[in-house]
Amino acid sequence: MRERFGRRCCRETIRAALHRHKLSWKKAKKLLGRADPERRQAFVEQLRDVLAGAQRDRPLVVFLDEAHIHQDADLGSGWAERGQRFWVSSRSPGLSARVSVYGVYLYNEGQVRLWPFPRANGEPTVAVLQRLRTEAPDRKLLVLWDGAPYHRAQAVREAARTLDIELMPLPGYSPDLMPVEELWRWLREDVTDHHCHASAEDLVQRG
């Protein structure tokens, strides 16, 4: 303001002016510019055919994603008295105190699963594939997921072949094509928002 217009004013004055012009303060979100448009378009066309087949009950389409949910509180906005800070109690358990959650969306069934593990890597990923096959022993399974390194690991790919599970990777930098992302948003808004969990068990039970 001072550099461009040669005037000085406090932040509250600027905020009030912006509110009058119907602007609001929002948290920024990244717009990923590294995605390949052609690969995304090809994937969307392929996905359209896959989902059309799923409506005829073949194959069982599974969207699978992972998230690391911390025991400490996720801080967001909330109501507080004017002139008072909005305090949230925390035991500061540290960033290493977390649970890795595998989120599963069964498209044909309209159902979701949340399967917690101490970490997300090759071994629990194989366990998740085995669990999916146990739930659907006689159906063709198609798993859609991102390009996480452990998704591409040889042990995971071999397990998928052994279990007769087809893998369909999403194009890079395309979280908008993963519906499980909405599950993570719900989890952080309804479970971890402004709430510090005493233990990993407490976090899992509350989720």
Segments and roles (model prediction):
Residues 1, 14, 65, 103-104, ...:
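Generic structural signal for small/hydrophobic residues in well-ordered secondary structure
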Residues 1-34, 60, 67-69:
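Conserved short alpha-helical interface segments
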Residues 5-8, 43-130:
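Extended, low-complexity cationic-aromatic segments
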Residues 13, 57-61, 181-207:
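C-terminal anion-handling pockets and recognition modules
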Residues 62-64, 142-145, 169-171:
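Short beta-strand segments
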Residues 84-94, 163-182, 195-196:
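RNase H-like polynucleotidyl transferase catalytic core
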Residues 139-151, 178:
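Acidic/histidine-rich, metal-coordinating catalytic segments
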Residues 153-162:
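Short, aromatic/basic amphipathic alpha-helical patches
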